[in-house]
């Protein structure tokens, strides 16, 4: 038993068996009804061990997902529009000029025609959103350069006009006017991850700060663009760091939360780390769902590499979105395989609701 304080009382959490399962189901019902998990409760849940007990946690998280988000799994795809020689020193990334990873591609901005062609292919594969991702610290620092930004805006508009898919962007840090320009061009969602907790962040990046990233998220929200903001699990951070990250995302009221599972890249400072254990990843996903009941939780990088044949379990542990197709510098599995996995789980690929949008169907 672990003694914790909830938002309304002090109680004990059993750590195994039927007692744990009953506590989790009761707490899930309370969260579905509008209560919120306390940080102390969340930290207590990290002590759950053993596959059967973790399955109980995942089952309760899945009930929250069904009740608060429904059975539609948000499908998106990405394209690396400019790669390599990045000025930043993110320890997990093979595109950094400080530690270029083995076999990491280096090229300038792709042509509008090539990007639009990929957008149409992503739509044909079932993706509902298509994210244009560029290396560099960000538009705020003229990276991509200003003329490249204008070309990206024009490309976004052409995707809207010619492809049956919604364009998103991930162009690094930006100012409020730059966010407003993206909004005017038709961008409704922008990816800018916090990557880690504020406490752990200096261990993986030193060329910019965690607060720099938070400022960009706030600029996005102020411009009326949905924030697709999450992080990476498996960089050597503690469970406290993971919980702190989740609560920071809740405080920022982001709409979509990519959960990346570190796939260590040779040549990077984190390349020596072991891959995350799949059940550790499942536990993290489930706890994130308890903390973020209405957010879109997105399987992102590392899904295939870390989860392997257990990928489907994430979709029954709180996940309700995923990238399909390839990632920035690594390959993903064929979209048809993802669609088959969803069908086996009686889930529907599409566009998931953002917080406050889901309306459960009323029985007639």
Swiss-Prot record:
Residues 68-303 form the Radical SAM core domain. [4Fe-4S] cluster binds at residues 86, 90, 93. [2Fe-2S] cluster binds at residues 131, 168, 228, 298. SUPFAM superfamilies: Radical SAM enzymes (SSF102114). Its cofactor is [4Fe-4S] cluster; [2Fe-2S] cluster. Pathway: Cofactor biosynthesis; biotin biosynthesis; biotin from 7,8-diaminononanoate: step 2/2. It catalyses: (4R,5S)-dethiobiotin + (sulfur carrier)-SH + 2 reduced [2Fe-2S]-[ferredoxin] + 2 S-adenosyl-L-methionine = (sulfur carrier)-H + biotin + 2 5'-deoxyadenosine + 2 L-methionine + 2 oxidized [2Fe-2S]-[ferredoxin]. Coiled coil: none annotated. Binds 1 [4Fe-4S] cluster. The cluster is coordinated with 3 cysteines and an exchangeable S-adenosyl-L-methionine. Binds 1 [2Fe-2S] cluster. The cluster is coordinated with 3 cysteines and 1 arginine. SMART domains: BATS (SM00876), Elp3 (SM00729). PROSITE patterns: RADICAL_SAM (PS51918). Gene3D superfamilies: Aldolase class I (3.20.20.70). The keyword Cell cycle does not apply. Keywords: 2Fe-2S, 4Fe-4S, Biotin biosynthesis, Iron, Iron-sulfur, Metal-binding, S-adenosyl-L-methionine, Transferase. GO terms for biological process: biotin biosynthetic process. GO terms for molecular function: 2 iron, 2 sulfur cluster binding; 4 iron, 4 sulfur cluster binding; biotin synthase activity; iron ion binding. Its EC number is 2.8.1.6. Belongs to the radical SAM superfamily. Biotin synthase family. Homodimer. PANTHER family: BIOTIN SYNTHASE, BIOTIN SYNTHASE, MITOCHONDRIAL. Catalyzes the conversion of dethiobiotin (DTB) to biotin by the insertion of a sulfur atom into dethiobiotin via a radical-based mechanism. This is Biotin synthase. It comes from Microcystis aeruginosa (strain NIES-843 / IAM M-2473).
């Amino acid at each position: 038993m672990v003694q914790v304080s909830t938002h309304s009382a002090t109680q004990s959490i059993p750590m195994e068996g039927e007692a744990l399962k009953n506590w989790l189901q009761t707490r899930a019902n309370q969260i579905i009804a509008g209560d919120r998990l306390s940080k102390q409760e969340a930290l207590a849940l990290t002590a759950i061990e053993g596959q059967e007990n973790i399955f109980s946690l995942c089952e309760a998280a899945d009930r929250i997902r069904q009740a608060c988000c429904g059975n539609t799994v948000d499908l998106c795809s990405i394209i690396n529009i400019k790669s390599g020689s990045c000025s930043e020193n993110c320890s997990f990334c093979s595109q950094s000029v400080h530690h270029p990873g083995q076999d990491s591609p280096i090229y300038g901005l792709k042509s509008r025609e090539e990007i639009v062609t990929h957008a149409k292919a992503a739509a044909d594969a079932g993706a509902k959103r298509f994210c244009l991702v560029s290396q560099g610290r960000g538009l705020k620092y003229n990276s991509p350069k200003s003329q490249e930004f204008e070309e990206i805006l024009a490309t976004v508009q052409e995707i809207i006009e010619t492809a049956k898919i919604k364009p998103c962007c991930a162009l690094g840090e930006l100012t409020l006017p730059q966010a407003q320009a993206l909004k005017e061009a038709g961008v409704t969602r922008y990816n800018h991850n916090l990557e880690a907790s504020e406490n752990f962040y200096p261990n993986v990046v030193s060329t910019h700060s965690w607060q720099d990233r938070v400022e960009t998220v706030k600029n996005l929200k102020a411009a009326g663009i949905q924030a697709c903001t999450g992080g990476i699990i498996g960089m050597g951070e503690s469970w406290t760091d993971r919980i702190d990250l989740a609560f920071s995302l809740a405080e920022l009221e982001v709409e979509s939360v990519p959960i990346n599972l570190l796939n260590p890249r040779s040549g990077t400072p984190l390349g020596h780390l072991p891959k995350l254990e799949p059940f550790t990843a499942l536990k993290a996903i489930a706890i994130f769902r308890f903390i973020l009941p209405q957010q879109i939780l997105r399987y992102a990088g590392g899904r295939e590499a870390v989860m392997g044949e257990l990928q489907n379990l994430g979709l029954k542990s709180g996940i309700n979105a995923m990238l399909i197709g390839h990632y920035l510098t690594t390959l993903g599995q064929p979209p048809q395989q993802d669609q088959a996995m969803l069908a086996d789980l009686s889930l529907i690929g599409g566009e998931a609701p953002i917080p406050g949008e889901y309306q459960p169907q009323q029985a007639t």
